[in-house]
Amino acid sequence: MKGLVKKISAPGLWMENLPIPSHVKDDEVLIKTIKTSICGTDVHIYKWDAWAQKNVPVPLVIGHEFIGEIAEFGKNVKGFKIGERVCGEGHIVCNQCPNCRMGRKHVCMHTKGLGYHISGCFAEYFVLPAENVFSLPPSISDDLGAIFDPYGNAVHTTLAFNLIGEDVLITGAGPIGIMAAAIAKQAGARHIVITDVNDYRLDLARTMGVSHAINVNRESLDNFMQSLGIKYGFTVGLEMSGHPDGLKTLTEKIRHGGNIALLGILPPATSIDWNLVIFKMLTLKGIYGREIFSTWYQMVHLLEIGLNLAPIITHHFSVDNFEKGFEVMLSGQSGKVILDWV
């Protein structure tokens, strides 16, 4: 079978001919891949930057965003059938730590990541624990199923705090930030403002129905707030950029007693004015992945009541042309990029 492998400790990926997994354990499922989506994490691995060099074993099949169908399952697996369309949770948990035993698996203390700690989904077939598999209703397209992982990040972050009638500032108009803006609108926020320095991404946000998309290199956020009647500051902030300036902006523009959820991965030495956090009594909440599986059901329900994410998928490539997919991702001129496996 075909598989995209980080073969050696160097930039790039390699298309390899791999054996189809032949031993499916009693509690596992063998999945035939239909589509995968390229994540920013995959780009880090492709570039082989400092984060990837530190965290990713070599050689490794990468990838964690997928839709596929069940090809085989172990004898203990119940509730699935051959040919069923599925996606899945890419965080493999231990089921033994205190958080897992209390039902809080999204904060497992020993989480392993599909495609960057253990063998991933960028292959024609791959194995996943049955407890991580999520069946998709027919109403959800293959394309949307392939991006359920990042969509779940957006849902988890956006709904971390009450949004009904609130004013929301999102720093970072990458695909997850843009999806977060659409989710916030669906969830009843009053004003939603998203900031970035990439005009392509801001235009994509507008295509997704975000009316307040600001290039902070050219436009004044203060003036924009004034035009919207936001006198005391935003009540909720979502940090999606992973850039120190994004966090700085949020601590300055969120009103006293406001809430900030952080998904973007900031540099380790990022500084913050803790006096603003303390004296404004701000609440900061880190977000990693999705709540297992409550976020997943929210994802389905939001789509069923009209959330439209289709425009966030901007490019499709055959997996044989995966290099072009990564080039588009590296250009910054894309939303989500899909690789077709069948």
From Swiss-Prot:
Subcellular location: Cytoplasm
Enzyme kind, highest EC tier: oxidoreductase
GO molecular function: L-threonine 3-dehydrogenase activity; zinc ion binding
Binding positions (Zn(2+) 1): C39, H64, E65
Residues where NAD(+) binds: I176, D196, R201, L263, G264, I265, I287, Y288
Subunit structure: Homotetramer.
Pfam families cross-referenced by the UniProt entry: ADH_N, ADH_zinc_N
Zinc found in the keyword field: yes
Function, in words: Catalyzes the NAD(+)-dependent oxidation of L-threonine to 2-amino-3-ketobutyrate.
Site residues by UniProt (Important for catalytic activity for the proton relay mechanism but does not participate directly in the coordination of zinc atom): D149
Record-given protein name: L-threonine 3-dehydrogenase
Catalytic reaction(s) noted: L-threonine + NAD(+) = (2S)-2-amino-3-oxobutanoate + NADH + H(+)
Gene name tied to this protein: tdh
Keywords in alphabetical order: Cytoplasm, Metal-binding, NAD, Oxidoreductase, Zinc
Cofactor(s) it depends on: Zn(2+)
